[in-house]
Amino acid sequence: MDQDALISKEDSEVEREASGGRESLSDVIGFLDAVLSSEPTDIGGDRSWLHNTINTLQRPGSTHRVKGEGEGEVSTSSTQDNRSGEESRVSGGTSEPEAEAHARNVDKQNIHWATGRGASTDSVPQDLGNGRDSGILEDPPNEGGYPRSGAEDENREMAANPDKRGEDQAEGLPEEIRRSAPLPDEREGRADNNGRGVEPGSPHSARVTGVLVIPSPELEEAVLQRNKRRPANSGSRSLTPVVVPSTRSPPPDHDNSTRSPPRKPPTTQDEHTNPRNTPAVRIKDRRPPTGTRSAPDRPTDGYPTHPSPETDATKKGIEENTSSMKEMATLLTSLGVIQSAQEFESSRDASYVFAKRALKSANYAEMAFNVCGLILSAEKSFANRVDENKQLLKQIQESVESFRDIYKRFSEYQKEQNSLLMSNLSTLHIITDRGGKTDNPDSPTRSPSVFAKTKENKTKATRFDPSMETMGDMRYKPDLLREDEFREEIRNPVYQERDTEPRASNASRLLPSREKPTIHSLKLVIESSPLSRAEKAAYVKSLSKCKTDQEVKAVMELVEEDIESLTN
């Protein structure tokens, strides 16, 4: 079957769906089987009819009318029918993946749009104005030469031969869908619902997906038989309410201390009677229940009565256990483990509860059970204590680390304070011992530079006159001559002045200068030294106060000593 027959089939399918006639979905599935069982389109065949000139106005039968239930007439084209048929094929459960079907739909739609655009300029606004009609030819020429068959003829043939579905079975479509009962038809077409009309009729199963399970009488009988097997031993199960009152009511001659704890495992006979509902852990304990022990003379249906010697031994063991529990409480009180015997009785701790059970136990199996519980509860309490100690040690370690950090910062701060204090002391040492210079530096007595506030005798500043150079006073000599007198004494080359202007006139010496170049270079030497900032400031200040070369030399010797002490 070629593609023309496929498109015309799907067009007739959409016409029949939209005309208002109600069909069951089983017929739809049968029609899908007929479509899917056909041979695939020959891809390498002649498809030149797709590129013929399209003129939708010449072919009045290219579009058809579709009328909805509550809407007006809407004209649909073969492109939309083709798309809806493809979508119904995908939703019908074919074996090809959804991605291939979607790619084929897009490919077809692109071909139709390409032919529609290449036809003429008149077809473009027509395609854009009507969003659904792409202008494809309704009945393209049959160049393949295949015989055409109408959709109505095939539907009649499928209705006449219902067994043809099994013969025309497609790959991947399960047989259960084909043999199922007709599903109820939803009130909307698959073209509008994207093929989801089949979904509400299929029962959902979490284990088997994609297979429709139809309930049959045999299946119902099997389910009823399976449900009837559970209460099979109901006669033996009805015995349990008789045992419960005897378990709950203790005999009047025992006090509350002899009452057995409520968390007792059941008896061995209970395990044989109802093996399905009992946990696997309780099979190990084979002691008789407490109610049977405390009321031996009351016979119950299905339980043999215990002989009286065993009952007497049980009562005797319970009395002995009560006395031993009192002795244990007294011992624990005397050792200081607990405050009083009442605390041992009323304690809800797991170890105390298992210890009381072990002391009250009547046989070795019960005692072994309770001793195991006591050991496990003690081990659990020890593990909890170990965890608490680990948390405490972790907190202590964190606090120690924080203290180390604080101590480190404090030690750095202390070093900084010590260096500041030492610089202050060195400054004070320079001010007191090296300061307060007099005119005679050789005099042993040195007056401090810090004076009390007294009236100072201000010397009148004498104005410089060039005739003062000839006088014998050292202060009025020019600087170059003055430096030359001490040139032999200064061994350090730092003190040597650079003769920047050797041919300077005599008048350049008359200009007042605030600072000698030698003092300036010495200050630069001090500033570039590795001393602290306070020491540098103190030495520069003391250097500016010097009046003679001997004082400058003494200050620089101190600077050199400090630098050597730092470097060494």
UniProtKB/Swiss-Prot annotation:
Its main location: host cell. Residues 33-41 are annotated as: N0 binding. Residues 479-568 are annotated as: Interaction with the nucleocapsid (N-RNA). The keyword Cell cycle does not apply. Residues 364-429 form a coiled coil. Residues 7-20, 99-110, 150-168, 175-193, 453-462 have a biased composition (Basic and acidic residues). Residues 412-445 are annotated as: L protein binding. The modification Phosphoserine is found at residues 249, 257, 260, 447, 449. Residues 1-23, 54-317, 433-462 are annotated as: Disordered. InterPro entries: Paramyxo_PProtein_C (IPR002693), PProtein_oligomer_dom1 (IPR043097), RNA_pol_Pprot-P_XD_paramyxovir (IPR016075). SUPFAM superfamilies: Multimerization domain of the phosphoprotein from sendai virus, Phosphoprotein XD domain. Keywords: Chaperone, Coiled coil, Host cytoplasm, Phosphoprotein, Viral RNA replication. It is found in: Host cytoplasm. Residues 344-411 are annotated as: Multimerization. GO terms for biological process: DNA-templated transcription; viral genome replication. Homotetramer. Interacts (via multimerization domain) with polymerase L; this interaction forms the polymerase complex. Interacts (via N-terminus) with N0; this interaction allows P to chaperon N0 before encapsidation and form the N-P complex. Interacts (via C-terminus) with N-RNA template; this interaction positions the polymerase on the template. The P/V/C gene has two overlapping open reading frames. One encodes the P/V/W proteins and the other the C/Y proteins. The N-terminus consists of a long intrinsically disordered tail. The central part contains the coiled-coil multimerization domain (PMD). Forms a four-stranded coiled coil structure. The C-terminus constitutes the alpha-helical domain that binds to the nucleocapsid (N-RNA complex). Essential cofactor of the RNA polymerase L that plays a central role in the transcription and replication by forming the polymerase complex with RNA polymerase L and recruiting L to the genomic N-RNA template for RNA synthesis. Also plays a central role in the encapsidation of nascent RNA chains by forming the encapsidation complex with the nucleocapsid protein N (N-P complex). Acts as a chaperone for newly synthesized free N protein, so-called N0, allowing encapsidation of nascent RNA chains during replication. This is Phosphoprotein. The gene is P/V/C.
